[in-house]
């Protein structure tokens, strides 16, 4: 089962738990143009593995193998992040099915839902919470 958590909870866990890791499953284009969580204060780097390929949107068939290739083990607590919590849910489910028991979906995502004017990053999510982020 995948537990939903909020960005602020994840930031606290990344700082407090040596076994905590953040896996950003957005596309390369999103990492470049929208930005990335800046985990320097937690002495970590986000792990970048796309769940879907850009621009086709096809699911990355090598996702689990790439996750294992980062050195992640079942002992790690893995927090999955996407724009607004949908792709990260799918990625976390795949990781759990592959034997990673401590997986979490960052439900509010990096940018969260759109506001009344259709803009993201204002209502909820990593950016809206004021958590550290940077351009790639």
Regions found by a protein language model. Give the residues of each.
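Rhodanese-like catalytic fold shared by cysteine-dependent sulfurtransferases
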Residues: 1-21, 28-77, 88-136
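Short, surface-exposed ligand- or partner-binding patches at beta-edge/loop junctions that are enriched
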Residues: 80-81
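Conserved G/P- and acidic residue-centered "switch" motifs that form tight phosphate/ATP-binding loops
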Residues: 85
């Amino acid at each position: 089962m995948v537990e939903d958590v909020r960005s602020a909870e994840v930031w606290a866990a990344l700082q407090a738990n040596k076994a905590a890791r953040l896996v950003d499953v957005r596309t390369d284009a999103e990492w470049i143009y929208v930005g990335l969580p800046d985990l320097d204060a937690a002495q970590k780097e986000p792990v970048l593995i796309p769940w879907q390929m850009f621009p086709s949107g096809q699911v990355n068939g090598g996702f689990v193998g790439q996750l294992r290739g980062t050195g992640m083990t079942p002992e790690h607590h893995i927090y999955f992040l996407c724009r607004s919590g949908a792709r990260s849910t799918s990625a976390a489910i795949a990781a759990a099915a592959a034997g990673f028991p401590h997986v979490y979906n960052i439900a509010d995502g990096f940018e969260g839902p759109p506001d009344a004017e259709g803009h993201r990053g204002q209502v909820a999510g990593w950016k809206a919470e004021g958590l550290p982020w940077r351009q790639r």
